[in-house]
Each structure stands twice: as structure tokens, then as C-alpha cells.
Amino acid sequence: MNSRIPEDLIERAHRGKTTKEDALLLLEVPPFELFRFADELRDLAAGDTVTYVVNRNINFTSRCTGSCGFCAFRTDDGKVLSIEEIMEKVREAEKANATEVCIQGGLLPDVGLDFYQGIVEAIKAEFPEMHVHSFSPMEVYHASRISEIPVKESLRRLKRSGLDTMPGTAAEILSDRVRKIICPAKLNTAEWIEVVTQAHAAGIPTTATMMYGHVETPEERINHMLTIREIQKETGGITEFVPLPFMPYNNPVGEKMIKEGRYATPGLEDLKVYAVSRILFHGHVDNIQASWVKLGKKFAQFSLHCGVNDLGGTLMEESISRSAGACHGEMITVDELEWMIHGAGRIPKERTTLYREAHELASRNSRKIAGCGAFE
């Protein structure tokens, strides 16, 4: 069969040198040819193993001084969990054999770095082996301003307190044109890059995300990925790339889209994003993650044939996507995740946050994560 993908593009991709022009051309290739190429590169980078992490999300407050137009989670007067309330959720996670807690929340007007350090220190004092994967670049930037200390120093202090890794959220699209429309009060592109690269310098690896499907252009998506790739070439501190389709419900940006006759990204477009991500990041970021909360379980399963090699976590609770209209649940058992992976013809493997093999695991089909009711 004649390929619509030029040979020189294929050769550049294998060397980790896919260009912006290459990526834009790939978006025009017949979808299943694109998926096949991405799947070949996935096999080279990760083999037939599909990973997941047993974790728990903890959103400590919906109260936020921010004004992001895409957010359906923020409130003006939401409850702020105390450290003891956060710890109770961590204890429940530990009982459910979680290896990671991911803690994030809204931006509080008078809460500086001490609050964030206190959370980490409380967790590490009681559960020194629990991996703390917490606080977005925006939270760190905001806390630094409140505490009147440089971001670099904030990250050093968080590292000393025991912060292991950070989620590379708050990235949205790394284009100031886009950010001025959807999140004008949020840190700009250069500031996001500064927080992430300073985190890596402090010994705190991060993930990297991209929230797409709102006001950005295809070229801005590609530029976003190339920016992440350049960071990775400089620091090597990014563990995974996570494309996140925008949920256009219950938020101003989405309401405007719907009035204009535009809705959530079509599924085929989502799969193209995952495939192009795999190709652009080949040789740089080995792990491409699909969010089953955003895509749905069956579609996330199909993404495993489009370049994806990781399905994220069990979560146990997920408030942010759900508030914006995601309807695919907020927890999943290890049994079901492994069933999905086997059903896609792949080999499931529990991992740590840093993509190392989790202790005492080959396949824990006998061990289940408690349902949501156990955490209410």
C-alpha cells in the first residue's frame, strides 16, 4: 500500500526531529494511516506494555481568585479542606494501596507557601513512602507571590518539605494569544516555562499537559508540543505528555462555543492529537497518556492503538472534569483498567509516578480499589 506519509518525514520522526511542518502535514494524512505510524513509534518507545498508577486525586478547595473562562470548578466561597481533612483522604488512599496522591486546588487570596509545605510535610510525616505529586505551576507561582519569594526558592522549599513531583497542568495552550482569551489572569507562557524548568532544576520532575479544543488553531497546538519538547531537550524532567480535550459545558468559553455551533472535539480529532503527540515526542518523551475521564473508557482503550501507552490513574475522585460536563466517572478499579488493557491486546502493568515498576506487582487482579462510596 502506498503511504501518504513522505519517507523523509518518517526518517525525521524516527530520529526525533519531526518539524512543525511535518506535524501539520500529518494532520492531513488519512487517519488510520496516521494511527498506524504512531502505533509503530509507540511500540519502539514502550513495547506492548500499557501502564497505570494507583492514585487518588484530592482537590482541597474550589474557592479561587482566578477568572479562567474554561473553568466550571471554581467558586467564590467553596470549603477549604483543613490539613487533617486532607490527611483523612490520604489515609483512605493508603488503605486502598495507592502509591500516589495528587493534590491541587483553587488559588486562595491569602494563602502562601507555608500552607502547601504544611500539606506535604503532614503527608510525609505519616506516610513517608507515599508519592506526593502535587500543586500546579500556577499554584506555585501564586503562592510565591503571596509569600513574596522567588519561584526558585519556593520550589527549593517544597522539595525540602518532601514534594516528589508536580503535575504540569495550567499549561492549557502555551500561546499568549490564546491565554489572553481563555485565562488572562493566569501566568503567561514564559512564566509557565519558568516554573516548570525551575522545578526540574530543583529536582522535581513534572508531567506536561495540553488542553485543546477551544479557541486555539492547529498550528498553536503543534507549537505547544514543540515548546514542551524544547523544555524536555533542555532539562529531561518531563515524565509524560497528557493531551486533555476541553469540556465545553458549564463555563463561559464553552457556552460561547456552543452558541456558535461548536462543541467538544470530535473523537477522530482527539485520536489525531494523540497520534501526532506520539510522533512529535518520539525520542524525547516516551509516555503519552490518555485521560479515560475525558475520553471515556472505550475510547481511551482505542487510543492505545493510536500512540498512547498509559491510561493514567484510578483517581478515586475527580471533581474538575466532572464539573465541566465529563460523564465517564471519577474512579476505576485496577481490575477494570487491566480488563481494558487486555481487551486492547496489550499487557497491563502498574507503575509508580516516575514510571518505575510498582512494588509487589505482576498483575494484581485479586486486589481491588474501593468504590467511590468508601470515600464519601
Swiss-Prot record:
EC assignment: 2.5.1.147
Enzyme type, top EC level: transferase
Cofactor(s) required, per the database record: [4Fe-4S] cluster
Keyword Iron-sulfur: yes
Cofactor note: Binds 1 [4Fe-4S] cluster. The cluster is coordinated with 3 cysteines and an exchangeable S-adenosyl-L-methionine.
Record GO terms (molecular function): 4 iron, 4 sulfur cluster binding; 5-amino-6-(D-ribitylamino)uracil--L-tyrosine 4-hydroxyphenyl transferase activity; 7,8-didemethyl-8-hydroxy-5-deazariboflavin synthase activity; iron ion binding
Enzymatic reactions: 5-amino-6-(D-ribitylamino)uracil + L-tyrosine + S-adenosyl-L-methionine = 5-amino-5-(4-hydroxybenzyl)-6-(D-ribitylimino)-5,6-dihydrouracil + 2-iminoacetate + 5'-deoxyadenosine + L-methionine + H(+)
Record keywords, A-Z: 4Fe-4S, Iron, Iron-sulfur, Metal-binding, S-adenosyl-L-methionine, Transferase
Pathway info: Cofactor biosynthesis; coenzyme F0 biosynthesis
Domain Radical SAM core: 50-275
Superkingdom, taxonomy of origin: Archaea
Binding-site positions, [4Fe-4S] cluster: 64, 68, 71
Pfam families from the UniProt entry: CofH_C, Radical_SAM
Listed InterPro entries: Aldolase_TIM, CofH/MnqC-like_C, CofH_family, Elp3/MiaA/NifB-like_rSAM, F420, FO_synthase_su2, rSAM
Quaternary state and interactors: Consists of two subunits, CofG and CofH.
Annotated PANTHER family: FO SYNTHASE (COFH) (PTHR43076), LIPOYL SYNTHASE 2 (PTHR43076:SF1)
HAMAP family: FO_synth_sub2
Family (UniProt): Belongs to the radical SAM superfamily. CofH family.
Function, in words: Catalyzes the radical-mediated synthesis of 5-amino-5-(4-hydroxybenzyl)-6-(D-ribitylimino)-5,6-dihydrouracil from 5-amino-6-(D-ribitylamino)uracil and L-tyrosine.
Protein name, UniProt field: 5-amino-6-(D-ribitylamino)uracil--L-tyrosine 4-hydroxyphenyl transferase 1
Species in which this protein is naturally found: Methanosarcina mazei (strain ATCC BAA-159 / DSM 3647 / Goe1 / Go1 / JCM 11833 / OCM 88) (Methanosarcina frisia)
